[in-house]
């Protein structure tokens, strides 16, 4: 096999039991410069067992492209729906040999079972590698080496973590239970300055225990997310960060800190349930086209936005407020940058709201920068004998740009109307009309005279 495609098709059973550190059940060793690709198709069973000591060159299926004559060629493994690959605790299930000296791309398609008792089931080296799964299962972690790698799972089961190394990597996981995936790691960091941009998309699933690490951009599509450690880091540059789309829910619990930007589409929700002590932070900017809410029946939760806040028409911000005097407890939105756009404020009176006269008002939105957004109340806000309305700017500082609920109107001091300046003939014209009317009445005389 020195030219063209090296091809192996297994529909039977291949079982190798050996202690050797450099043992493979099925191996393709491509050394020729005339080789164009190497492909293994498995619809049967391939098993490597008997290993005791782990070695990076021990694998049930292995590609080797080493030597001075080696070239970068596609290395393809297809595991069909009936295919089974099993490896012991000293072995990988599928790997590109550590002796590889080039950037051959490993392309793995799995609809069957790939499993290893070792921590890693799949390991590749430098190259633009691909793993695709539409059914079946992957039992063991995956490491795709440096390069622009792609990991795509649209079905089946994954038990193990996914690690992608340096490069601009893409991972898409949909309709897969993430509870058995401890970590999804995009590689180097969350900065775009190095040219490596990693994107993770999670669709039709939920995140509760999975750590999401080193992704410049994370897109949640019809997905519920709750951080297992109350933090998440994403890209901080414009166009990167955490994106909630298609009815996704970010359940922020009682405390959550996002390093990066947050974008909420019209059907998605950022939700905090802090019971009055919730603390939530977004280090970057927030674009809200959907709903941000800390309504949980208790006032006092705080969302702090380190960058700008942009409200898209139709967006809402929901809070709990004790409706009383100026010192009343309320949920609060703090924006350290600028605000723009429009959002609707929905205020739910906290239990026991007495209603009282305010002076300055109850501050519900605190803007440090330019306050260019327009917030409007969704409906009447009432407690006791009082009704509260929403005002921009304070009383003592009428240009502070903050937003207040007030139960008193600030009177407008009337101004005297301007005095008009008439031309000289105007007074004669007006007095002449009066004189003519009087003369006419005098000419009528009395009834007796007539």
How would you name each of these model-derived features?
Residues 1, 17-33, 50-74, 87-100, ...:
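Extracellular beta-strand/beta-solenoid scaffold signature
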Residues 34, 102, 125-127, 146-149, ...:
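Short, solvent-exposed linear patches
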Residues 138-139, 148-152, 157-337, 341-342, ...:
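Extracellular beta-solenoid/beta-roll
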Residues 23-26, 55-61, 91-94, 131, ...:
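Glycine-centered small-residue motifs that form tight turns
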Residues 5-17, 37-50, 74-86, 105-115, ...:
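Right-handed parallel beta-helix
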Residues 35-37, 72-74, 102-103, 215, ...:
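A broad structural signal for short, well-ordered beta-strand segments within beta-sheet-rich domains
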Residues 15, 412-450:
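Outer membrane beta-barrel translocator domains of Type V secretion systems
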């Amino acid at each position: 096999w020195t030219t063209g495609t090296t091809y192996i098709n297994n529909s039977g059973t291949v079982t190798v039991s050996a202690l050797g550190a450099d043992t493979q059940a099925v191996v393709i060793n491509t050394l020729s410069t005339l080789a164009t690709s190497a492909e293994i198709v498995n619809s049967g069973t391939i098993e490597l067992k008997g290993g005791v000591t782990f070695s990076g060159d021990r694998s049930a299926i292995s590609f080797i492209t080493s030597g001075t004559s080696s070239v970068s060629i596609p290395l393809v493994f297809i595991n069909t729906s009936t295919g089974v690959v099993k490896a012991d605790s000293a072995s990988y299930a599928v790997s590109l040999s550590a002796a590889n000296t080039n950037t051959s791309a490993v392309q793995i398609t799995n609809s069957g079972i790939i499993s290893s008792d070792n921590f890693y089931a799949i390991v590749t080296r430098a190259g633009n590698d691909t793993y695709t799964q539409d059914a079946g299962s992957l039992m063991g972690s995956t490491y795709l080496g440096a390069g622009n790698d792609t990991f795509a799972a649209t079905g089946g089961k994954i038990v193990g973590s996914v690690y992608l190394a340096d490069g601009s990597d893409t991972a898409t996981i949909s309709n897969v239970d993430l509870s058995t995936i401890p970590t999804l790691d995009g590689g180097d960091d969350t900065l775009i300055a190095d040219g490596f941009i990693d994107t993770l998309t999670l669709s039709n699933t939920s995140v509760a225990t999975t750590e999401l690490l080193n992704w410049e951009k994370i897109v949640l599509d019809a997905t519920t997310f709750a951080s297992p450690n109350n933090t998440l880091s994403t890209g901080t540059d414009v166009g990167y960060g955490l994106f909630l789309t298609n009815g996704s829910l970010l359940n922020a619990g009682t405390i959550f800190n996002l390093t990066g930007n947050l974008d909420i589409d019209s059907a998605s929700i950022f939700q905090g349930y802090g019971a009055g002590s919730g603390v939530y932070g977004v280090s970057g900017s927030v674009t809200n086209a959907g709903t941000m809410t800390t309504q949980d029946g208790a006032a006092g939760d705080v969302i702090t936005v380190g960058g700008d806040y942009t409200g898209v028409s139709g967006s809402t911000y929901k809070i709990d407020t004790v409706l009383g005097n100026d010192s009343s407890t309320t949920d609060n939105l703090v924006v350290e940058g600028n605000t723009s756009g429009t959002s609707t404020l929905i205020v739910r009176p906290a239990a026991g709201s007495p209603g009282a006269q305010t002076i300055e008002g109850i501050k519900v939105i605190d803007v440090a920068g330019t306050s260019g957004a327009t917030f409007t109340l969704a409906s009447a806000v009432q407690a006791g004998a009082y009704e509260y309305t929403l005002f921009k700017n304070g009383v003592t500082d009428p240009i502070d740009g903050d937003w207040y609920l007030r139960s008193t109107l600030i009177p407008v001091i009337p101004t005297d109307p301007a005095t008009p300046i008439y031309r000289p003939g105007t007074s004669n014209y007006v007095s002449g009309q009066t004189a003519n009317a009087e003369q006419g009445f005098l000419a009528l005389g009395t009834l007796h005279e007539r």
